[in-house]
Amino acid sequence: MKRRKFSSVVAAVLIFALIFSLFSPGTKAAAAGAIDQAAALENGKEQTGAMKEPEQVKWYKVTPGATDIQKNSHMALTVKSDSVLNVSVYPSKEKALKDETFEMYRSFTAEDGKSEVIFPYAWSGPYYVKVEYLGEEEPEDGGTAEAAAEAKYTIGYKGTKKQPSDLEEEEACPVEMSVDQKKSGKGILDKLRSIRDEQLSQTAEGKELTSLYYKAAPFIVAKLALNKTARNEIYQDLVTLKPLFDDVSENGASSSYKVTEKDQKAINRLYDKALQSVPSFLKEEIKKQADRLNMKQLQGKTAGAILTENNIAAKSEVQTTKVIFKVKDNKSLSSVHNEMKGFSASAQSKKDISNVKKAKKLFDNLYSFELPKDEKQNGAYTASAKRVKSAAATLSKMSNVEFAEPVQEYKSLANDIQYPYQWPLKNNGENGGVKNADVKYEPANTLLSKRKLNDTLIAVVDTGVDSTLADLKGKVRTDLGHNFVGRNNNAMDDQGHGTHVAGIIAAQSDNGYSMTGLNAKAKIIPVKVLDSAGSGDTEQIALGIKYAADKGAKVINLSLGGGYSRVLEFALKYAADKNVLIAAASGNDGENALSYPASSKYVMSVGATNRMDMTADFSNYGKGLDISAPGSDIPSLVPNGNVTYMSGTSMATPYAAAAAGLLFAQNPKLKRTEVEDMLKKTADDISFESVDGGEEELYDDYGDPIEIPKTPGVDWHSGYGRLNVMKAVSAADLQLKVNKLESTQTAVRGSAKEGTLIEVMNGKKKLGSAKAGKDNAFKVNIATQKQDQVLYLKATKGDAKTSYKVVVVKGKPSGTPKVNAVKTKDTAVKGKANSKAMIRVKNKSKKVIASAKADAKGTFSVKIKKQKAGTVLYVTAVDTDKKESKEAKVVVEK
């Protein structure tokens, strides 16, 4: 039989017409007896098989060994046959019996009679493979179908290592078409996938429709692949239905779009073509469902009403694409815009970079802008990845631009074996990053591996967590989980966001699978408050926070945001009062304002950094930002078993939450405020000042400039700095506590483990050092420091090494200096005052006649001319805050 090249977009469009024909058909389950007889497949060994009847199924299972898992990240399963065979791979027997798997793990024998599924080693196995015979194609001339022949095939798999860049995205549309058709086809394909993945997958009816899609697709595309006229007709209908697809994808069951007469005719034509393409047994199944709903009488109905009848409701998420660029030092954004006027580039590139004049200033000379919308597509954003890359390349060639590159909100890539790609744990400086700009996971892990730690409960209040993945097995407390969306105890993730967050926190290390989480002692409480589209109301979230606190969580991760709510604020206070540390994402708007609940006083707000150790372009910043952590291109687990790159403060927050959990694991008696303070005071300073002196300008609602407030030791964009886990856990290990240091004090005091070496630094200059004694107390003598001076206290003992930020606060004014007796023969006024105080000697008229600084111990000697007996002098001390003491009156003696 001649095989034909297929188009997934054509199949998807045709099958979408069947959405309206679905009427509670009931999900078909696999026969338990058949799956129990599944044949075992071995790595590198092929097997043969044969089936005689349509809809016949053969089962196989794969149980990868430890060596295979450590060596390979995926298996490449191949089925070869001249017949039409559907192939599905499942992560477990339970999933196989329910026919639940991801689209990328379904395939069918194509043009060359070969089907390949790349499946990740992300579950503990065994994995199950279903091979299904679908019968033969209907003849194109309408004649009698060929008698079903025996379907012979070969099946086998090989282990393979897929690096992140090796993962392939779904094929857009291999069918031959014009450029305009490719654009339309790709755009509509994205909408249809959104409808299928975010809406149909949520109901039994939707799953049955999807199952029907996989059965019918091979036959539909085979009919159309070689028929150009039919394809053109399909695309005309596709364009007709585009507004319907757009509205349903965006609004789900809330769609108010009414099916028009033109829509109805397009649906009818698509439906008829589908019926003409499939074998008899599928044709009857499709017709039965269409007749039940009277599919050809949909005109005038709203899409939302039709979807509601079928229990399908979800909302997709729209994404944008940006370019980020840095203007060279001593240059400005206007200089780039002026250079563009005479710059040689293609018309498309010039159009794409035209929005540079509207670029948003992130900080210093770093800017971002969005490519202009394509007006030909009704204002829809259609810029391709190729166009974005080209725009960045064009900017990079300009003399006033230091660099430019595309900024992507998330990027799907591949899957311990993927540890080299976890730059937040170990940044090697690759892909434009800065070496060692990471959270210092490896030295922290080395230190903690020698210590006895307690398990710590961390609640992920999110979309749920997929606990079936091997890297999260035993890490998720499903017995403590709850679903506030479905109002049950099944907190399984149906969106992916919560699993990604949980992987960052607690994925098992050194087990060969997938990736490494930051906190080996974390146990995740999955609390589902967001639905399959990633949205939820304040009441659900508030209840989730309270629930997590009541279940014993020491840390709550809130990678979500929205408007202020008194209900939510109450829940935050409730948890804080129970000594729960709450980490909340600062927001992804790139604005000078924190989102809520990050702006609440009851949480630790977390911003995001990138590989270059700078605040990420999307990260909200400003007043109240506590700390930053890696949040750009962060790899972690998603429910389909792969490790996926995502960007956002949602990804930065779990690093801070995991680090907080480690401190509680070291000492469960710590207060949440102590943990937060330790994380902030040990963070790495990543702030920098503009070389050309330019500063970010802020404006109020009336357009008047606002002065950026200055807080010593805190950066406007990154808070206290980028998370440093090694310093934080070392501080906890050393039991380090530092007393407040006032500008009038001459010693830094605190406590630490006996023998801990304490050094006080002002930049690279050491001001003093001492060791903690048997009573754990330390005192480091230093000269008095000015108010707001930022010092760093280095503490070291064994493997534990930390640097703790100390900001000098305003001290009490200097006391009246103690002055020695002054005689007529003396040429100096001597005495004691505060360390480094400026001593002023005044005459009877209170005019300063001499001055000098006291030394580090407060001893002073101010040179004066010899005075007559009975002369009255006044002596004062001016401290580092420039506060002058009361006068000490001295009468010169003989």
Curated annotation (Swiss-Prot):
Paired cysteines (S-S): none
Location within or outside the cell: Secreted, Cell wall
Swiss-Prot/TrEMBL induction comment: In stationary phase.
Record's keyword terms, sorted: Cell wall, Cell wall biogenesis/degradation, Hydrolase, Protease, Secreted, Serine protease, Signal, Zymogen
Enzyme Commission no: 3.4.21.-
Documented activity regulation: Inhibited by PMSF.
Signal peptide per UniProt: 1-31
GO biological process: cell wall organization; proteolysis
Catalytic EC class: hydrolase
Span of domain Peptidase S8: 422-729
SUPFAM superfamilies, A to Z: Subtilisin-like (SSF52743)
Record's protein name: Cell wall-associated protease
Domain of life: Bacteria
Organism: Bacillus subtilis (strain 168)
Loss of function: phenotype: Cells lacking this gene have no discernible phenotype with respect to sporulation, motility or growth. Significantly increased amounts of BglS, Epr, Vpr, YclQ and YwsB; decreased amounts of AbnA, PorE, Csn, YncM, Yxal and YweA are detected in the extracellular proteome.
Similarity comment text for this entry: Belongs to the peptidase S8 family.
Active-site positions on this chain: 462 (charge relay system), 497 (charge relay system), 650 (charge relay system)
